[in-house]
Swiss-Prot record:
Gene3D superfamilies: 3.30.70.260, 3.40.50.1360. It comes from Synechococcus sp. (strain ATCC 27144 / PCC 6301 / SAUG 1402/1) (Anacystis nidulans). The lineage of its organism: Bacteria, Bacillati, Cyanobacteriota, Cyanophyceae, Synechococcales. GO terms for cellular component: cytosol. The keyword Isomerase applies. The active site is at E108 (proton acceptor). Pathway: Carbohydrate degradation; pentose phosphate pathway; D-ribose 5-phosphate from D-ribulose 5-phosphate (non-oxidative stage): step 1/1. Keywords: Isomerase. This is Ribose-5-phosphate isomerase A. Its EC number is 5.3.1.6. It is an enzyme of class 5 (isomerase). One of its GO terms (biological process) is D-ribose metabolic process.
Length: 232
């Protein structure tokens, strides 16, 4: 296993180890979250974890949870989420995030905002001084409104483009049946204000700014052959 892959496994394992029996767990989406689900499933199968329920944030995490024997539930069926574990595309020094590279940010925000503790798992390349400097901001929009929303985003200083699918003709379609505009901002210095401004645009379902939600970030780091996980 190469050092980078090893690091991702260690971060995922560290996150999965924080889940305790009897908890309701929010399952994130993406490559590191997928590894976390695998380790969580291992703990369920060997009897280390009992009586847990998981709320998936995407079709991907739902399929993985079923594959690894993790009992699933839904937001509407639980009165709490004890812990949510998810990845991120960017993390700033205040632990604000950009998420949505997998077009799952709407359901992710629903689950992560509900959680008593929200843990983010990333590698050090995702740490930035200001959001928007390395990753476009995803905005989920109603299909019939994407042009109108795009013009409104331009007035906010953004440069939107419709996310296109790789293995199908046409745009990416979210689990909710909507489209995604990826918006370039030179730098997002006031993420809370921008999050609200974008969500106030008619036709927007949700954007990928996660402000004030994160309780802990687990950062995987590689130094030569040495792999470590630190908290912030």
């Amino acid at each position: 296993m190469d050092p980078v892959t090893h690091m991702k496994h260690e971060v995922a394992k560290a996150a999965a180890s924080r889940v305790q029996s009897g908890m309701v767990v929010g399952l994130g989406s993406g490559s590191t979250a997928a590894l976390m689900i695998q380790y969580l499933g291992d703990r369920v199968r060997n009897g280390e974890l009992t009586n847990i329920q998981a709320v998936p944030t995407s079709f991907q995490s739902s399929v993985l949870a079923n594959e690894y024997g993790i009992p699933l539930t839904t937001l509407n069926e639980v009165d709490r989420i004890d812990i949510a574990i998810d990845g991120a595309d960017e993390v700033d020094p205040q632990r604000n995030l950009i998420k949505g590279g997998g077009a799952c940010h709407t359901r992710e925000k629903l689950v992560d905002a509900r959680a008593e503790q929200f843990i983010v798992v990333v590698d050090s390349s995702k740490l930035v001084e200001a959001l928007g400097t390395t990753f476009l901001l995803p905005v989920e929009v109603l299909p019939e409104a994407y042009i109108q929303v795009g013009k409104a985003l331009e007035k906010l200083g953004g440069k939107p483009e419709l996310r296109m699918a790789v293995k199908k003709a046409g745009p990416v379609v979210t689990d909710q049946g909507n489209l995604v505009l990826d918006v370039k901002f030179d730098r997002i210095d006031q993420p809370a204000e921008l999050e609200k401004a974008i969500n106030n645009i008619p036709g927007v379902l949700e954007n990928g700014l996660f402000v004030g939600l994160t309780d802990l970030v687990l950062v995987g780091e590689v130094d030569g052959d040495r792999v470590s996980v630190r908290e912030f």
